[in-house]
């Protein structure tokens, strides 16, 4: 799970490559803008690591629907939780999520995102991209961004890296923890 999370965090910081004349959907533009802003923050040598972390946290919180993700991750346990427990859990989940990438912001090493297109999947839009790093350590990874667009408010719901859903992996990890600790 940590390897997948590390890949996710690096992928959040990638600079997209636009195809000249491409007719990007609103969701494709969202992914491109998110990656552009992330790389601008992470490549800024004029600010401290703490400032980078604060700016990146603000960007992530504005782009990812952590409320919805946290509910999905908790699964059945969410339904039986009290309102107070739900509120405390969402707050703790956000802190956990943010802290999981805070020390990994320096891992960006020039990867680029190529937006391949998008498709509808029920109420979601899947933006298909490839992560490319060229040079001595060539890398190509397929990444699918699951987005929810509610009246123009687009949020990242999940990332699927080479067929592995990060949200489902997170859910399995949390469910295992709950099962092993009397839930």
Where are these regions (language model features)?
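A mature extracytoplasmic/lumenal domain signature
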Residues: 93, 117-119, 131-133, 145-147, ...
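Early exported N-terminus immediately downstream of N-terminal targeting peptides
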Residues: 24-101, 105
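Positively charged n-region of N-terminal signal peptides that target proteins for export
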Residues: 1-5
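Non-transmembrane domains of secretory- and envelope-associated proteins
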Residues: 165, 169-183
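Short beta-strand edge/turn micro-motifs at domain boundaries
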Residues: 142-168
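Surface-exposed, charged secondary-structure patches
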Residues: 99-141
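Bacterial N-terminal signal peptides
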Residues: 7-16
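Sec/Tat signal peptide C-region and signal peptidase I cleavage site
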Residues: 17-23
């Amino acid at each position: 799970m940590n390897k997948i999370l590390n890949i996710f965090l690096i992928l959040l910081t990638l600079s997209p490559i636009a195809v000249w004349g491409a007719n990007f959907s609103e969701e494709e533009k969202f992914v491109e803008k998110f990656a552009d802003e992330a790389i601008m923050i992470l490549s800024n040598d004029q600010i401290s690591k703490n400032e980078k972390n604060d700016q990146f946290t603000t960007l992530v919180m504005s782009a990812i629907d952590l409320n919805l993700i946290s509910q999905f991750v908790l699964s059945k346990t969410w339904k039986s939780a009290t309102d107070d427990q739900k509120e405390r859990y969402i707050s703790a989940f956000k802190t956990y999520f943010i802290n999981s990438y805070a020390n990994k912001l320096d891992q960006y090493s020039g990867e680029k995102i190529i937006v391949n297109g998008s498709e509808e999947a029920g109420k979601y839009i899947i933006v298909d991209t490839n992560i490319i790093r060229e040079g001595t350590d060539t890398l190509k990874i397929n990444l699918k961004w699951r987005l929810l667009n509610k009246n123009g408010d687009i949020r990242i719901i999940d990332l699927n890296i080479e067929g592995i859903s990060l949200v489902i992996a997170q859910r399995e990890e949390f469910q295992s923890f709950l099962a092993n600790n009397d839930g």
